[in-house]
């Protein structure tokens, strides 16, 4: 698509199937891609902590003031990069919430101080929430990796939900689906 002068009649879609560009060098004006993947979860726990309280394993984050934190049930066991510890972020109710402490195997915590957040609230790990958006390319860069690795590392514990025109048209849950 970038090289019309070639005599080949096929192209390797690769990462473009996710609506992501294979490299920064690609002319993005020549081919407009729209991200085809969003990653969502939900809040499972909300807790107030005191100043001086450590968060997560190793307490690599220590609260410098009283804070409210929310627990998100996603971790490196799902393919979410541990390298986002203390530097990644999510969106809850359209607002950016920073990851506090280490990303664990099955969960991580975020700062929701001053927000009206409750258990069950939708969490956007990648995608749009209101006027805000988290791009997989940005998360991959924060994690010190690239978009291919980010999307390929998402494991079978993460259910797939296929949406077309705002409606769910299919699902794949490797733990809930029946196999014969």
Outline where the language-model segments fall.
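Active-site anion/phosphate-binding pocket segments in diverse small-molecule metabolic enzymes
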Residues: 1-180
């Amino acid at each position: 698509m970038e090289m019309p002068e070639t005599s080949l009649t096929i192209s390797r879609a690769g990462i473009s199937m996710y609506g992501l560009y294979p490299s920064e060098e690609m002319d993005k004006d020549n081919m407009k891609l729209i991200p085809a993947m969003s990653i969502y979860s939900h809040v499972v726990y909300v807790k107030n902590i005191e100043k001086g309280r450590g968060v997560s394993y190793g307490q690599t984050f220590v609260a410098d003031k009283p804070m409210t934190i929310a627990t998100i049930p996603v971790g490196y066991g799902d393919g979410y990069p541990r390298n986002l510890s203390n530097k990644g972020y999510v969106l809850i109710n359209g607002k950016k919430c920073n990851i506090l402490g280490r990303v664990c195997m099955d969960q991580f915590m975020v700062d929701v101080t001053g927000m009206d957040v409750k258990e069950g609230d939708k969490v956007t790990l990648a995608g749009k929430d209101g006027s805000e958006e988290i791009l997989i390319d940005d998360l991959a860069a924060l994690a010190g990796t690239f978009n291919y690795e980010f999307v390929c590392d998402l494991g079978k514990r993460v259910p797939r939900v296929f949406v077309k025109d705002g409606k769910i048209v299919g699902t794949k849950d490797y733990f809930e689906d029946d196999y014969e």
